[in-house]
Amino acid sequence: MLGIARRRLGSGCALGQLMQALRPAAAAAAARTYSAAAKEMTVREALNSALDEEMSADPSVFLMGEEVGEYQGAYKISKGLLDKYGPDRVLDTPITEAGFTGIGVGAAYQGLRPVVEFMTFNFSMQAIDHIINSAAKSNYMSAGQINVPIVFRGPNGAAAGVGAQHSQCYAAWYAHVPGLKVLTPYSAEDARGLLKAAIRDPDPVVFLENELLYGESFPVSAEVLDSSFCLPIGKAKIEQEGKDVTITAFSKMVGYALQAAEILSKEGISAEVINLRSIRPLDRATINASVRKTNRLVTLEEGFPQHGVGAEICMSVVEDSFEYLDAPVERIAGADVPMPYAANLERMAVPQVEDIVRAAKRACYRAVPMAATA
């Protein structure tokens, strides 16, 4: 694969010419609705099909990582790709995240489009220098002359009984960095449309999946199954409309928020659930528009509470919609401790549906103190 880049450069092609194959992501509304579902698709199948279609459409796209080839991926996301595209485009690497991530960034410098898979995003810490100091900063440091079209993808956050070193959520970590885009799919539609957008994007994208979602099935429409389907980066989706309280969530927590909303509806509380999809850039407009309608906000994430995604959302609402709030913002996050290994303690460290229900009720039944409104 790297030889392709060398031959291209050797033929006198400028890096800018190599980037001409970039296909813009299709523009779409923040809240998309589709006709009746054409079929059910798992998140695993959605990711696999997106990779397959993008590799078929663009020969500069390739996949690299530990066990992505012969083993077809630790979670079988790359099933069938080695047989179809060969070892030049589906590269099994040694167990050295720093090594193969650096190779991927170098390939992106030369106009290729690497998709780098981490077996878990916890292992991306081994490659943090290449992700932050090389991939994220090169466009700025080159005054826009160098694009780095690379995707870093893999499971992020808590799974089931894998301990503190395999369970951390890195959404807030990477969202802190200028030059990176951070995507967090929930459904099969999200996974398929956002991965296509990430691969086509001219900038580095951190694509945070969830191990527990890989096997979950979601209804998808014929439009989602079309090879041209692509979701816009930076646009949230309103999964459920409501009028009493806004709940923001991403990745697996979206499902929890929807379950909580169903419980709340039986008690007369109408919750609006926003699937963030994109953490950086953050769809502040959709969030603030919802809060201006419901006048209450609950933020939900499984990462650590301090300096988290919820804190950023809260600040956005304070800056743009403070006068619309009828109650203090409720923030739900994981426990401020490394993830326990024991199943009972692990459950206590991750937000649960009942936590969301309680927070939404607090938001609905509390009011801003009179002193604060004076």
Curated annotation (Swiss-Prot):
GO cellular component: mitochondrial matrix; pyruvate dehydrogenase complex
Known catalytic reactions: N(6)-[(R)-lipoyl]-L-lysyl-[protein] + pyruvate + H(+) = N(6)-[(R)-S(8)-acetyldihydrolipoyl]-L-lysyl-[protein] + CO2
Record: residues binding thiamine diphosphate: 97
Molecular function per GO: metal ion binding; pyruvate dehydrogenase (acetyl-transferring) activity
Biological process per Gene Ontology, one example term: pyruvate decarboxylation to acetyl-CoA
Keyword line: Metal-binding, Mitochondrion, Oxidoreductase, Potassium, Pyruvate, Thiamine pyrophosphate, Transit peptide
Superkingdom per UniProt: Eukaryota
Transit peptide: 1-34
EC number(s) recorded for this UniProt protein: 1.2.4.1
Subcellular location: Mitochondrion matrix
Binding sites annotated in the UniProt record for K(+): 150, 198-199, 201
Cofactor: thiamine diphosphate
UniProt keyword Mitochondrion, yes or no: yes
Quaternary data: Tetramer of 2 alpha and 2 beta subunits.
Role: The pyruvate dehydrogenase complex catalyzes the overall conversion of pyruvate to acetyl-CoA and CO(2). It contains multiple copies of three enzymatic components: pyruvate dehydrogenase (E1), dihydrolipoamide acetyltransferase (E2) and lipoamide dehydrogenase (E3).
Name of the molecule in the record: Pyruvate dehydrogenase E1 component subunit beta-1, mitochondrial
Species for this entry: Oryza sativa subsp. japonica (Rice)
